[in-house]
Amino acid sequence: AGLLNLLTICGWFGIFISRDKEKDMIWPDMLWFWIIAYDLWNFAYVYNCVGDHSFYAGAALLISCTIPAFFIKRGAWLQHRAHTLALWMMFTMAVPSFVTSSKFAVNASHNDAALMTVSAIALAANVAVALYQIYVIVRGRKNPLRDELYTDLEAYKSVREANI
C-alpha cells in the first residue's frame, strides 16, 4: 500500500504559494482521495510496526493534519502534515514516556486479525487510487511526472481558485 501511495503522488509542478497573508504551500493535485489513502496506509504502517504508538502517532497525528486540509485550508495538506509531524516528533523525543508508560499511554490489541484488516483496507484504498490515476492518465494522455492530473475535477478547481 505504501509503495502504491508513493507511486500515485502527482502534480509536483502545480505546487504554488497561496496569495493570502499566510503564504501557504498549496498542492491542488493532492486531493481528498489520495489523502484518505495515505492516512489509511500510514495508520496501517504505524499500527503494524509500532502498535502501541498507533493511537497518537497514527490516528491523532493523521487526523490533526487531515481535518484542516478538508475544512480549514484545502490544498495545504502536505504543509499541515509536515508541521504536525515535526511537533509530534519534538514532543515524543522530549517526553518519550508519554506514549510508553504514562497514564496517557494507549496499548494496541496486537491482534493479528486487526493488523491484517487495517492493512487490507489500506491496500484496497491505495489500489483504488492507483487504478483511478491510471484511468485519468490514459484518458487524458497525461504525463504523471510532469502534468497535473486532476485539473478537470471540481475539487482541484476550487483549491486552485481559493488560493491564486
Feature names for model-found ranges:
Residues 1-76:
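Generic multipass alpha-helical transmembrane bundles of integral membrane proteins
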Residues 57-163:
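C-terminal transmembrane-bundle signature of multipass membrane proteins
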